[in-house]
Amino acid sequence: HILARDCAVTPESISIQDPVDVVLGSPRLKEAAEPLVEWFRANKRDLPWRQRMNAYRVWISEIMLQQTRVEAVKPYYERFLKELPDVKALAEVPEDRLLKLWEGLGYYNRARNLKEAAGQIVRDYGGKFPETYEEIRRLKGTGSYTAGAIAPFVYHIPKPAVDGNVLRVVTRITACGDDIARAATKTKIEKLVEEVIPPDAPGDFNQSLIELGAIVCLPNGEPKCGECPVRELCLAHELGQETDFPVKKKEKKRRIEKRTVLVFRDENETAVRKRPARGLLAGMYEFPNVEGHLTREEVIGYGKKLGLAPIRVKPLPAAKHIFSH
């Protein structure tokens, strides 16, 4: 699509009389940019990472917010920054203390990657946070979304920050039926967003898309179209198909495992072991456990292999543990 005026189009060229906006992707999204920014500035939530905004604070918040709800992150974020207020402190904190600060947020590799990236910043940039999208993107554990958040929010660089909220908003505005689980679809949406970023408000525009998806253009049910500042530009709304977008194919079936968990206790002490440094729940502590159901005799034999001699074996009630790491 080309949105232009006073122009002549031939197979070889486009001649334009006066400077105009040329949109090769989505004219609807281009037209939505200004009202989205105005709406965001008037309606944005008061969040701790939006106060005294700098690269380090935004970085920590964006990593914490991956796969985690805003309300759950708030107390962790404030406690984390109080103890680790800058890159140097994060680079030097012992891993056990770092994981204790992160305890309860899950996806612990996020914390390890933060520490490793902080070391990169100290080593390669003298402790000063890098200021270009490409340099930020090279930090350990920093993908296109996180780099695309820091670059425009802090340094006003016109790069897209496309997360699940933005995928939902853009696919609804454009009625894009591509599967959002595919990397190619995310790349396509990133290009659409990047093309229409207002040069004078890259941070607010990116945040407006995220904010709209978080509080208005909701998933899993009816979106609040009556509160949307761009509903008249939304093709899905025009078609009455808001809940048909985004399109996402079903995820793989869950794997179910049955294990026997052994809680070896001696007065006030309990035996735990550390998981391998790589793989599922890497480096985390756990109770010894084995696949399948162990009999009393097998528990005693397994304990002896660990250098323990159970005196009494007491069965515990069955329990279910679900996680998505």
Each model region followed by its residue ranges:
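Catalytic cores of DNA base-excision repair glycosylases
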Residues: 16-26, 34-35, 39-226, 230-239, ...
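Intrinsically disordered, low-complexity, charged terminal extensions of DNA damage-control enzymes
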Residues: 1-46, 51, 214-325
